[in-house]
């Protein structure tokens, strides 16, 4: 491999975006574990993103995101847009709420448009029944944002007492999901290989 080829082989930067901002939540622990597994499986760079650090209003932008960054008027929107634009791909780690995914995650998605386009996405849900419904909804929305979603969407199941207590050891609780997660990260990595502009 020549030096120019090596320079082009840049390690993708992946944002692990947490879907929950509840005070008593499992999301940070699970997202950290998922990110660490992703690093082992793909050797990409993973950064955890907590939406509590990104207070985005529901309705303070006069323009539509599809019109581009020139319509952004709020500093928090500009900062969020810059954060997402600087990433090469995403992992969403989210609980399922009442058959769907959290409003905070929907708001974060809807604040932007072009910044999401064409980028690989891996969806990991969790809950008493695994969160398959919320994952399906996220996949649908991601399609409208022109993201490229890994086919396998791990749905991590948790017993009710773990959810209520807000304490979990993913390495113990999710052993049965390891095969599915490894498969999903394999598909996620292949999405970069199939995109000539974003090779690992």
From Swiss-Prot:
Reactions it catalyzes: FMNH2 + NADP(+) = FMN + NADPH + 2 H(+); FMNH2 + NAD(+) = FMN + NADH + 2 H(+)
Gene Ontology cellular component list: cytosol; nucleus
UniProt KW NADP keyword: yes
Keyword set, alphabetical order: Cytoplasm, Flavoprotein, FMN, NAD, NADP, Nucleus, Oxidoreductase
GO molecular function: FMN binding; FMN reductase (NADH) activity; FMN reductase (NADPH) activity; FMN reductase [NAD(P)H] activity; NAD(P)H dehydrogenase (quinone) activity
Gene3D superfamilies xref list: 3.40.50.360
InterPro entries xref list: Flavoprotein-like_sf (IPR029039), FMN_Rdtase-like_dom (IPR005025), NAD(P)H-dep_reductase (IPR050712)
Binding positions for FMN per the UniProt entry: 22, 96-99, 126
Function: Has several reductase activities that are NAD(P)H-dependent and involve FMN as a cofactor. May be involved in ferric iron assimilation.
Name used for this protein in its record: NAD(P)H-dependent FMN reductase C4B3.06c
UniProt lineage: Eukaryota, Fungi, Dikarya, Ascomycota, Taphrinomycotina
């Amino acid at each position: 491999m020549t030096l120019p080829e090596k320079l082009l082989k840049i390690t993708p930067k992946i944002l692990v975006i947490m879907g929950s901002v509840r005070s008593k939540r499992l999301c940070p622990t699970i997202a950290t574990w998922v990110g660490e597994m992703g690093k082992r499986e793909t050797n990409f760079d993973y950064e955890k993103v907590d939406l509590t650090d990104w207070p985005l209003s529901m309705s303070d932008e006069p323009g539509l995101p599809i019109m581009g960054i020139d319509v952004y008027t709020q500093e928090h929107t500009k900062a969020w847009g810059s954060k997402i634009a600087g990433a090469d791909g995403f992992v969403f780690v989210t609980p399922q709420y009442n058959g769907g995914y959290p409003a905070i995650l929907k708001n974060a998605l809807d604040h932007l448009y072009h910044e999401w386009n064409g980028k690989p996405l891996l969806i990991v849900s969790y809950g008493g029944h695994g969160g398959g419904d919320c994952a399906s909804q996220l996949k649908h929305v991601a399609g409208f944002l022109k993201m490229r979603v890994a086919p396998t969407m791990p749905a991590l199941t948790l017993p009710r007492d773990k959810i209520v207590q807000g304490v979990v050891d993913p390495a113990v609780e999710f052993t049965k999901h390891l095969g599915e997660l490894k498969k999903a990260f394999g598909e996620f990595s292949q999405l970069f290989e199939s995109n000539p502009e974003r090779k690992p």
